[in-house]
């Protein structure tokens, strides 16, 4: 039995259901600390925030602080997560969590440390790269485990901006590190892969010690680090937390926290058993390295915190790969350009995992299978599909959980397109508006029935996806406008659509079935806050309806969570049906994340 992290929570912290905000010291970000990155985990049940002083991990809904790490040197409180197993060694871990300015690939999962040197021309922005700073510019979670990907950032970076840190939060120290010649812009994690996004490259590593480089893909200039990774579809690799019980949720008694024990002794490796060199190079857990951030609900089981994959729509393709190949080739000829006649296969027995990123040309999206069956140790080469999605550069893209659908928007921000990753066929084309906008976030709902889109105009759109129009994903049943009956008919169309022939494309567009301008709520939020917070919001450009970047996550299939960087607030919007059988987005609750 291993003593896992237990998290201090405040049972009196309530989410707001109106325009009155309450603050709690256990859920706050310092006023003087700028949020640098917000990312949800793979099932969107948690989200992580990195800022100028460290990082935090929250449960998504209900919002609840799970982890708080403060990297400020000589700070009175370096963390606010109760972990008695580390004891007095926690401060030493904070002082020694950097691998040094020379760069390295290291593993700290066992007593035998493996180190591999890398040369780099970059040093830490804070000086020698010894970790004397505190800013975390990027954070990515690996489901609910204790492994997080960190990159230094902000005015005083904790780590060099060209260095990827795999942080073991159970030991509060660096587990792996990778250093590059250019800044690391984004990191995507799965249980078998580490995806590193550079300015013009995507590098795929195995999640092992030391990490093994599998593939490198060149891209168009990608300063925003745009990329997305689906959840690994191999069922045998999904259940990391098979020993998690309903009793593992922590209990609060008389203001004290009861610690929780987890048994991970049955788990030996983060890599699956069929992974190359898994016996010698995997990150060994040894019963001590892996823990989870449990859901606050005491009735939540292990399967609730693990993304489960269903492959029902793909059954026809898997059963008859020859037919599927022919269909994919024909479709790609008329709609897109593809580098392979073989479609991406997402069978139940495969280890399929979709990686999507901008291609080498403007408006192109490259789709690659980076699953565990594709690595340099075998003769199996990854299937690569190219989708010509837009005429302008890609600004935002997202995959559904199974990696069968990809939604994308260009820098114009007026049109949202959904393609099949297997056949590259265009399935839907939605219109956001007629004026330019920056799409800041997009997410599919958990059941792939809806797509939520958020822009810099603070408008949240939700589009309905009619799955009955592409049951076999072969292209023949697809549609370019998202209409035609079923659930897709909820989306709005222009009144003249279908009445007159040869209408311009604008009149044939499909619009979201519900939307909301979040500014109408933010204006009242500003009025209810203190004068000091009002001045801060105005200084950040948010008080007068200025630009703020929100990040979307789904809570269920009818509730959308938005986390705002500058305003530092959490919001929950719910899709409700009105009396006239229309749909609307209502803000049901919100909470400030700053003090």
UniProtKB/Swiss-Prot annotation:
GO terms for biological process: autophagy of mitochondrion; glycophagy; nucleophagy; pexophagy; protein localization to phagophore assembly site; protein transport. InterPro entries: PROPPIN, WD40/YVTN_repeat-like_dom_sf, WD40_repeat_dom_sf, WD40_rpt. Pfam families: PROPPIN (PF21032). It is a peripheral membrane protein. Residues 76-112, 270-339 have a biased composition (Low complexity). It is found in: Vacuole membrane; Cytoplasmic vesicle membrane. Residues 1-28, 76-132, 264-342, 467-490 are annotated as: Disordered. Its main location: membrane. Residues 474-488 have a biased composition (Gly residues). Keywords: Cytoplasmic vesicle, Membrane, Protein transport, Repeat, Transport, Vacuole, WD repeat. One of its GO terms (cellular component) is phagophore assembly site membrane. WD repeats lie at residues 30-68, 389-429, 434-473. GO terms for molecular function: phosphatidylinositol-3,5-bisphosphate binding; phosphatidylinositol-3-phosphate binding; protein-macromolecule adaptor activity. PANTHER family: WD-REPEAT PROTEIN INTERACTING WITH PHOSPHOINOSIDES WIPI -RELATED. Belongs to the WD repeat PROPPIN family. Involved in mitochondrial or peroxisomal functions and amino acid signaling pathways. May contain a beta-propeller domain involved in specific binding to phosphatidylinositol 3,5-bisphosphate (PIP2), leading to the association of the protein to the membrane. This is SVP1-like protein 2.
């Amino acid at each position: 039995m291993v003593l896992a992290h237990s998290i201090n929570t405040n049972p009196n912290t309530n989410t707001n259901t109106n325009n009155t905000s309450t603050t709690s010291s256990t859920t706050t970000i310092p006023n003087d600390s700028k949020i640098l990155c917000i990312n949800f985990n793979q099932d969107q049940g948690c989200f992580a925030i990195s800022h100028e002083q460290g990082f935090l991990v929250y449960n998504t809904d209900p919002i609840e602080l799970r982890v708080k790490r403060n990297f400020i040197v000589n700070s009175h409180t370096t963390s606010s997560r109760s972990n008695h197993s580390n004891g007095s060694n926690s401060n030493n871990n904070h002082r020694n969590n950097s691998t040094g300015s020379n760069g390295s690939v290291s593993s700290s999962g066992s007593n035998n440390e493996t180190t591999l040197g890398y040369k780099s021309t970059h040093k830490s922005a804070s000086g020698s790269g010894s970790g004397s700073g505190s800013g975390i510019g990027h954070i990515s979670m690996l489901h609910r485990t204790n492994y997080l990907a960190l990159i230094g950032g902000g005015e005083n970076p904790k780590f060099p901006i060209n260095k990827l840190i795999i942080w073991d939060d159970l030991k509060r120290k660096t587990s792996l590190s990778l250093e590059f010649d250019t800044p690391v812009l984004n990191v995507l994690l799965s249980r078998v892969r580490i995806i590193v996004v550079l300015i013009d490259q995507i590098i795929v590593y195995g999640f092992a010690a030391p990490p093994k480089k599998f593939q490198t893909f060149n891209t168009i200039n990608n300063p925003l680090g745009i990329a997305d990774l689906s959840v690994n579809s191999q069922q045998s690799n999904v259940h990391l937390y098979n020993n998690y019980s309903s009793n593992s949720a922590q209990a609060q008694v008389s203001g004290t926290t009861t610690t929780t024990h987890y048994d991970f002794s049955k788990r030996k490796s983060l890599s699956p058993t069929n992974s190359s060199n898994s016996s010698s190079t995997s990150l060994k857990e040894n019963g001590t390295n892996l823990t989870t951030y449990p859901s606050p609900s005491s009735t939540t089981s292990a399967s609730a915190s693990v993304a489960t994959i269903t492959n029902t729509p793909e059954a026809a393709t898997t059963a008859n790969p020859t037919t599927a190949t022919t269909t994919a080739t024909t479709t790609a000829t008329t709609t897109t350009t593809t580098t392979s006649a073989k479609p991406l296969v997402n069978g139940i027995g495969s280890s399929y995992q979709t990686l999507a990123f901008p291609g080498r040309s403007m408006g192109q999206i490259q789709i690659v299978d980076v699953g565990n069956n594709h690595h340099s140790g075998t003769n199996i080469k990854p299937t690569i599909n190219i989708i010509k999605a837009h005429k302008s550069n890609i600004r935002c893209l997202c995959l559904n959980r199974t990696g069968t659908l990809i939604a994308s928007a260009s820098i114009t921000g007026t049109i949202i397109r959904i393609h099949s990753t297997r056949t590259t066929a265009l399935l839907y084309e939605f219109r956001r508006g007629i004026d330019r906008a920056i799409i800041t976030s997009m997410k599919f709902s958990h059941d792939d029935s809806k797509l939520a889109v958020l822009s810099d105009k603070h408008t949240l759109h939700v589009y309905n996806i009619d799955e009955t129009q592409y049951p076999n994903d072969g292209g023949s049943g697809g549609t370019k406008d998202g209409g035609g009956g079923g659930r897709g008919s909820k989306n709005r169309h222009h009144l003249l659509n279908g009445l007159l022939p040869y209408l311009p494309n604008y009149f044939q567009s499909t619009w979201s079935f519900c939307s909301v301008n979040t500014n109408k709520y933010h204006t009242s939020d500003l009025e209810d806050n203190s004068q000091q917070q009002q001045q801060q919001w105005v200084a950040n450009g948010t008080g007068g309806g200025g630009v703020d970047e929100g990040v979307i996550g789904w809570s269920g299939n009818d509730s959308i969570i938005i986390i705002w960087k500058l305003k530092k607030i959490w919001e929950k919007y719910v899709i409700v049906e009105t009396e006239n059988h229309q749909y609307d987005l209502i803000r049901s609750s919100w909470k400030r994340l700053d003090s």
